[in-house]
Amino acid sequence: MLRTIGTKASGITFRGVRFQSTNPTVKKSKPLRKFLFRLGLLTGVFYAGGVAVSLKNDIVQDAFIEHVPLGEALLDFTEYYVNHPEELSFSSTKQKLQNFDKTVLIPKRGVQSAKVEDVEHIKNVTRGSADESVSLSKTIYSNLNLPSIDLEFKDEVLQSSVEHLNHLIDTIRTQVNTVDLLPQVEQLKSSIKELGSKYNSFVTDRNTAVEEALAKLDDELKTKYQNKELALTDKYISDLQETKRQIELKHDQILAKELDTAQRRILLEAENIIVQARINTLSEFESIISDKIDNERNGKLKNLDALAKRVEELENVQIKLFDNISNAEKLTNLKKTVSKINRLLISSNDGVDAKTLINEVNKFKTYSKDLNNELISSVLLNLPNDKALSNGVLSQAQLLARWDLLTPELRSASLLPPNAGILGHLSSKLFSFFLLGKSGTPTSGNDIESVISRVHDNLLKNRLDDALEEVSSLKGWSRKLSEDWIVEARKKLELQVLVGVLENEVSLL
């Protein structure tokens, strides 16, 4: 059983065993270390960002080199390794580290390193007056990683020079003795000399060709400039002459207009002077007459006022008489026009001439303008327009003739069955010849023969309204066939009715 013996501030005792409590230790803050770490980090970020931006932008690069310490050296270092990435390869880095382990004995420079390997014995080459021994050591050459020139030229001299350079680079990679390089160097020198001579001849030929081309181009430009100058001169002369001609023409027009205006102004002023002189003369004459009348009023001209009043009454009577005569003349013309229109509609056998009918209707409209009669104005508005009357109006005989021509088609249409085809039309046309027509007093039936007989009788008796009513009662295909006849008959009937109304109204005026 767990029993607590005692409790202290520094620990707890369980069953006689004291357990010491451990409080967590507080770490001391080191602000200087944090500051240096942050400063180094920010400096590294600043330099890395500055180098990266300077490689992309020349303006930033100039400012970075000029104002940032060690900016130029750091930028050169970065550009070198950017342009020579092979220097950062693993093999190259390893080789450099191996070379760092070797020391080379340099004369007069102190104690030799103990880590130098494969060092040959130092030989005395020269002895000076100071009796100093100069130690030379053979430098340990490592294999150089020089890249070859990977270029191809069509020119044999350039290609040969490139091959010699590549051969020299290969020799430098593998050999250390400079005596073996002499043939390659001589060949390279001869290739370079040949290349230089060829380059000089090329430059000479190019300069000569450029000078010739420039001279030729100069001549062409001079010729073109002269031709252009002549053309522009001719154009400017022609434009100047044309402008001069237009200015002269415009000046002549303005001068003529001003002369005409001045002449009109002078004539108007003269006319005004003459009119003013006449007015002054009349005023003087009126004043003289007025004085004489005033002087003679009490003598010979006592009854002058009564005479003037009588003359005014006579003038009013004369004006009324002239108005009555004018109205009578207008009414006479209206009656003549209406009678002529009615006569054209009734008595013509060859149809009503459209031009004559339109002229008479327009005359009637002209004569009736000053009457102010509402009935006549309303009838004139309901008359067919000139476009509707341009095709003329059929006479009674023409309507009868057209009805007779339409009768066989109506008989044939009356025999058509519903939804008739070609055979139905042919059979109805054939059987229509065997129908017996009705004549004499019309019957009261509704069959097609009774309708044809009644219409024919009404047309003979000049009852166009009854005939039109009978034809309008037709239905179906028969009504469709007679549509044109109904239009012509209705136009004639409307004209007859309206002209009759006009004739009655004019007779009552």
UniProtKB/Swiss-Prot annotation:
InterPro entries found in the cross-reference section: MIC60
Keywords: Coiled coil, Membrane, Mitochondrion, Mitochondrion inner membrane, Transit peptide, Transmembrane, Transmembrane helix
Superkingdom per UniProt: Eukaryota
Bilayer-crossing regions: 35-54
Mitochondrial matrix-side positions: 20-34
Topology, Mitochondrial intermembrane side: 55-509
GO biological process: cristae formation
Membrane topology label: Single-pass membrane protein
Coiled coil: 202-257, 293-330
Subunit structure of this chain's protein: Component of the mitochondrial contact site and cristae organizing system (MICOS) complex.
Entry's family note: Belongs to the MICOS complex subunit Mic60 family.
Protein name as catalogued: MICOS complex subunit MIC60
The organism's taxonomic lineage, starting at the top: Eukaryota, Fungi, Dikarya, Ascomycota, Saccharomycotina
